A protein has these predicted regions:
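Exposed acidic/Ser/Thr-rich ligand/metal-binding surfaces
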Residues: 126-176, 241, 257
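C-terminal "exit" segments of structured domains
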Residues: 223-257
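VWA/integrin I-like adhesion module and closely mimicked acidic/polar interface patches used
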Residues: 159-210
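Short beta-strand-loop
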Residues: 76-115, 195-204, 208, 212
């Protein structure tokens, strides 16, 4: 992983300032009001095989359309959230699969999920978490919604091994008032292969600890951990409900330390 230079840090800081300024401007000029602007940033790096990827993708779709998530949206003051979905892998491998959409009911959630399931996998590369965060920050800056809360929801199964320094981009996002939460997946299959993959997917203290220390941050930030991709959908439901309601995670969640 390369070191972030001063120019890059200034770029991240500039994105943070633009995000904060853009939020104020949208509120001033009557942009569409929502309770939350949420970016789902999904790891599709090569440590995730095709079967695991499909479980992850299906889990996102199931969570978005779940009764629990729809109920959480309906309980908000504005009864709507803005949602954007991107997939990422190595540096420069970030792609918006579904641009911003407002979810306020079953039909809008189902339409989003159906479009998501129809998209092919974006990448199969390395793991650049910092670059994914910066990419997601830019999406928030350009979102065009009046949202009192901005959240980046990062899912992944390994440590960052390429691209921007994770903590630097995390700190820039937090400085802009953005919360970054994590869904850390312990990929037992990849870890059992040994060598680099074992170290990548099971770092000292575990992948959830890595996310807690390096990735998440901001008001109410937390990381949820799962031990296989089969439980991805259930974990994402818990995570989305907590993010939408701005509440404590109900499952195996750990706060930013």
């Amino acid at each position: 992983m390369r070191t972030v230079r001063r120019r890059e840090l200034l770029g991240a800081a500039g994105a943070a300032l633009a995000l904060a300024a853009g939020t104020r401007a949208r509120r001033a000029f009557g942009a569409e009001p929502v309770d939350l602007a949420l970016v789902l940033a999904a790891d599709v790096s090569r440590s995730i095989n095709d079967d695991e990827f499909q479980l992850q993708r299906n889990g996102y779709a199931a969570a978005i359309t779940s009764a629990a998530v729809l109920n959480a949206i309906g309980q908000g003051e504005r009864r709507a959230i803005a949602l954007c979905y991107n997939e990422w892998a190595g540096e420069g491998e970030e792609k918006v699969l579904l641009d911003w959409a407002v979810l306020r009911d079953k039909d809008s959630a189902q339409a989003f999920a159906d479009k998501l399931l129809a998209q092919p996998r974006a990448y199969l590369g390395r793991t650049a978490i910092g670059s994914a965060i910066e990419f997601s920050m830019n999406l928030l800056a350009e979102s065009g919604f009046d949202a009192p809360r901005h959240v980046i929801d990062v899912s992944g199964d390994g440590t960052s091994n390429q691209g921007d320094e994770v903590t630097a981009t995390r700190d820039a996002a937090v400085a802009a008032g953005t919360t970054i939460n994590g869904l850390a997946i312990f990929n037992k299959r990849a870890a059992a292969l040994g060598g680099y993959l074992a170290a990548h997917t099971n770092p000292p203290g575990g992948i959830a600890k890595y996310y807690q220390t390096n990735v998440i941050g901001g008001p109410g930030a937390f990381v949820e951990q799962i031990d296989d991709f089969n439980s991805f959908g259930e974990a994402m439901i818990r995570k989305l409900v907590s993010e939408i309601a701005c509440a404590e995670p109900a499952g195996d969640g750990a706060k930013a330390g």
